[in-house]
A protein has these predicted regions:
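Beta-strand-rich interaction surfaces with strong enrichment in secreted/lumenal proteins
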Residues: 74-75, 119-124, 134-137
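Solvent-exposed serine/threonine-rich low-complexity stretches and specific carbohydrate-binding patches
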Residues: 103, 114-128
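Short, aromatic- and glycine-rich surface loops/edge beta-strands on solvent-exposed regions
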Residues: 143-154
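N-terminal prepro-regions of secreted/extracellular proteins
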Residues: 1-77
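Conserved aromatic beta-strand anchor motif in extracellular beta-sandwich/beta-rich domains
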Residues: 103-109
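Exposed aromatic-hydrophobic patches
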Residues: 88, 129-139, 163
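Short beta-strand elements
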Residues: 156-169
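Short, surface-exposed binding/anchoring microloops in extracellular/periplasmic proteins
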Residues: 66-103
Length: 169
């Protein structure tokens, strides 16, 4: 291949790369602006958005963990009219004497200003690095449901919560 053809090939490749970079950056910025706009329009109760999505997952914040607790998750999923899946997981940084999770189900209507208690349960394990629990629940439609979890590993404690998902009547 001649030097001239190689130079043209490099220039064309560079132009193609730059044009793809500009298109990708523009698409990403547009998607972020759309998401920010749509989040601003959603109602919120006590830190949880009221959403129409099929599921929501929450996680512990890094600042609230200690030396034993690594992370924790909470999850709620709409299974159909009048039924949800709810639960959570606690993960320790290593094997601990006692690890646990407490799960609280709360519900609210769109016009409410606070969540009301619906159901709860807990699970503890010993000499392991994780605890998980979940349930399928029959629920009343016309409400948003969220899951709040308390995560513990030995003396470290943290919490997580989901957004509220709408369940059809």
């Amino acid at each position: 291949m001649s030097v001239k053809k190689r130079g043209i090939s490099v220039i064309v490749t560079l132009m193609l790369f730059l044009s793809l970079s500009v298109v990708t950056a523009t698409d990403t910025k547009a998607a972020e602006e759309t998401k920010a706009r749509s989040v601003e329009e959603l109602a919120m109760i006590d830190g949880s958005y009221l959403i129409k999505d099929e599921e929501s997952i929450g996680a512990t914040t890094p600042m609230t963990r200690g030396e034993d607790l690594m992370t924790g998750y909470s999850k709620v999923r709409r299974l159909g009219a009048g039924e949800i899946y709810a639960g959570g997981t606690t993960i320790a940084a290593h094997t601990v004497e006692r690890i646990g999770i407490g799960v609280i189900i709360e519900r609210a209507k769109e016009e409410d200003t606070s969540w009301e208690f619906y159901d709860s349960w807990q699970k503890f394990n010993e000499n392991t690095d994780r605890a998980a629990t979940s349930k399928r629940l029959k629920v009343e439609g016309g409400y948003y449901y969220r899951v709040r979890c308390t995560h513990s590993a030995n003396n470290d404690v943290s919490s997580s919560f989901t957004d509220g998902i709408f369940v059809q009547p």
